[in-house]
């Protein structure tokens, strides 16, 4: 007796991808079940170099999905990463690939996780192309991701490249159940983000200015900041406290911080329970070591008694 599709799916869900590929060749019925599982989670990594400058895997995937539209609703997780070395030529050709992704990705309305890391795709000066961020070429028509819970957007940045526009704000405003957000290359605040947007957001990773524009009015309890410790100042730090729930977890391990920032954090964020810090002592080693210990103890005394974990990664 043939097993029902539900039973086959339950069995196939526990098999590795390599086995599913083999089973997909056994019969049309096995193929139908195995394909849906294989396409439920897509992870594409393109390594770009002077000898291979095109994100071919990404382009092949776009064409494959156009040939298999019945599998689009099966995809729950989509990750696309482009990695490049210094020998890679100027990425003008990547604009067309971003435009192609902008035609395909919006069709994945059942997505729960979206991770786009486009490497050098945005390393174009504004006068060479339309003033739109490379990632915005993909997300500008993504207005129906009602199930998206996790979103990560990033690309390499330098001076003179196309900045984010209100397309990003419109995209974020269309995500009613988003809980986890990472904006790794956004150095400014998100402009014109409606106050009612992202009502369920619980964690954010990005620059201090971006955090200061996103956290107010939202239930964020997990915050991870990137950049330089000087980017955290008395303008943006107070605004990070305007969350609807107290901040509990703060991760500063992506930046080397000085002791004075700990003092400011203890003043503005007394509800922090877990703090990850990469403490840069090289700025203070010309003082006596006992003085450093004394200052650090004084600063830590300001911190809330709610701390249950406190990690220091010392940079000498």
Predicted segments with their positions:
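Hydrophobic regular-secondary-structure patch
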Residues: 2-95, 119, 123-125, 206, ...
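Long alpha-helical scaffolds
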Residues: 34, 105, 265-269
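Leucine-rich repeat
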Residues: 52-63, 84-245
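Leucine-rich solenoid repeat modules
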Residues: 6-14, 264-316
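"… SH3/SAM/PH, and C2H2 zinc fingers" -> "… SH3/SAM/PH, FHA domains, and C2H2 zinc fingers"
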Residues: 7-12, 19, 28-30, 59, ...
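Long, well-ordered mid-to-C-terminal structural blocks that present hydrophobic/aromatic surfaces
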Residues: 234-287
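Low-complexity proline/serine/threonine-rich segments in eukaryotic and viral proteins
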Residues: 20, 144-149, 174-176, 244-248, ...
């Amino acid at each position: 007796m043939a097993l029902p599709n539900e039973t086959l799916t339950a069995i196939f869900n526990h098999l590795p991808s390599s086995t599913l590929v083999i089973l997909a060749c056994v019969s049309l019925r096995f193929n139908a079940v195995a394909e849906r599982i294989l396409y439920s989670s897509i992870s594409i990594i393109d390594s770009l170099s002077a000898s291979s400058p095109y994100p071919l895997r990404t382009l092949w995937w776009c064409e494959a999905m156009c040939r298999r539209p019945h599998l689009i609703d099966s995809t729950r997780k989509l990750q696309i990463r482009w990695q490049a070395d210094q020998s890679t030529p100027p990425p003008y050709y990547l604009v067309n690939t971003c435009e192609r992704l902008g035609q395909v990705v919006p069709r994945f309305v059942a997505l729960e996780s979206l991770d786009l890391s486009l490497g050098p795709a945005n390393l174009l000066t504004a006068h060479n192309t339309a003033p739109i961020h490379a990632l915005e070429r993909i997300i500008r028509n993504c207005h129906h991701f009602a199930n998206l819970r996790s979103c990560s957007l990033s690309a390499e940045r330098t001076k003179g490249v196309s900045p984010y526009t209100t397309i990003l704000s419109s995209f974020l405003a269309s995500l009613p159940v988003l809980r986890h957000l990472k904006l790794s290359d956004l150095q400014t605040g998100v402009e014109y983000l409606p106050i009612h947007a992202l009502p369920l957001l619980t964690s954010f990773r990005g620059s201090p200015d971006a955090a200061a524009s996103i956290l107010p009015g939202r239930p964020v309890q997990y915050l991870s900041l990137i950049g330089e410790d000087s980017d955290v100042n008395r303008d943006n730090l107070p605004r990070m406290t305007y969350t609807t729930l107290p901040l509990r977890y703060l991760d500063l391990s992506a930046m080397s911080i000085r002791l004075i920032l700990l003092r400011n954090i203890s003043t503005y964020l007394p509800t922090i329970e877990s703090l990850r810090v990469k403490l840069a002592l090289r700025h203070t080693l010309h003082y006596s070591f006992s003085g450093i210990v004394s200052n650090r103890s004084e600063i830590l005394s300001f911190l809330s008694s709610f701390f249950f974990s406190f990690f220091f990664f010392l940079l000498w």
